[in-house]
Amino acid sequence: MEDVAALSLVEAADAVASGEVTSIELLRACWINLDAANPRINAVIWQDREEAEAAARAADQAVRIKRPLGKLHGVPMAHKDMYYQAGKLSTCGSALRHDFRPAITATVISRMAEAGAYTFGGLNMAEFAQNPTGHNKTFGDCHNPWNLPYVTGGSSSGSGASVAARFNYMALGSDTGGSIRLPASACGISGLKPTQTRVSRYGVMPLSFSHDNVGPLARTARDCARVMTVIAGHDPRDPTSAREPVPDYESQMTGNLRGLRIGVPTNYFLDDADDPVVAAMESALVVLAGRGATISRFALP
């Protein structure tokens, strides 16, 4: 393969499982991009390369000896720096927590590891996840990989920028009022804010108990679907987490949207949007309708 860092998460995981590429090759390809561009983009604020390389080698050994592999086996990732890992740095984007090392590990991080993925570092974010642009006075602003003077969107700024810049194949973010959706949009990638209670929030810095969600940012919707299959599900350590069975989200991506009704507000939605944004939205609606969805336009009171 010419550029393994350009693979989607699903392509990368499948390539490792088939032996077409090794995990260490994926990791080093991502690091080449990171070393070249992170000084300008500032998406990654700390790394543990030694541990990540050890995890990659262990993943490759598992493939060689034909152990059962998880859905994300051998894929390097990173996380918004508000996910806790026991003994690891978790700054939450603030000088107040510049040396905070929690004693617990987030359920989502553990589930990703059980599926074979490994994280190599913490990603830039708005301080305590509290602004929509991704600016940060302590660790420096995160910049949009496509146009450095532009914002990445926040608060999961490093999550959006790192995936777009091909520093990793997916990143974990959080969304209280748009903090997965905004960076995904601004950085041109795919992001998913799950229905609240679908994914455990245990071990993730709380911002708003009634609004917080955690979820993936990746290159494709299929990538997000595979991650959701791994991280969703009840967690006894998060009493708000739902008990409904977790489907295989990826297998349900048939493209058939019959029976789905999509509401599109005619006000308070695209009122102040630039013309290209409106055009992109309308083009997306045409695609969705072509797949069988019913588009219902309505006015908000």
Say what each PLM segment does.
Residues M1-E53, G290-G292:
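An N-terminal boundary/leader segment
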Residues E11-S18, R97-R101, D212-R219:
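Short, well-ordered beta-strand elements within core beta-sheets of diverse protein domains
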Residues E50-R57, G116-A117, A126:
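Long amphipathic alpha-helix in the N-terminal Rossmann-like dinucleotide-binding domain
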Residues A59-V75, D223, M253-G263:
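Immediate post-signal peptide segment of exported/extracytoplasmic ligand-binding proteins
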Residues P102-H234:
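Short glycine/serine-rich loop segments
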Residues K71-V108:
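Enzymes and membrane/adaptor proteins characterized by extended Gly/Ser/Thr/Asp/Glu-rich
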Residues C30, A52, T105, C224, ...:
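Residue-level signal for inorganic ion chemistry
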Residues K193-L285, R291:
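A short helix-breaking turn/cap at a secondary-structure junction
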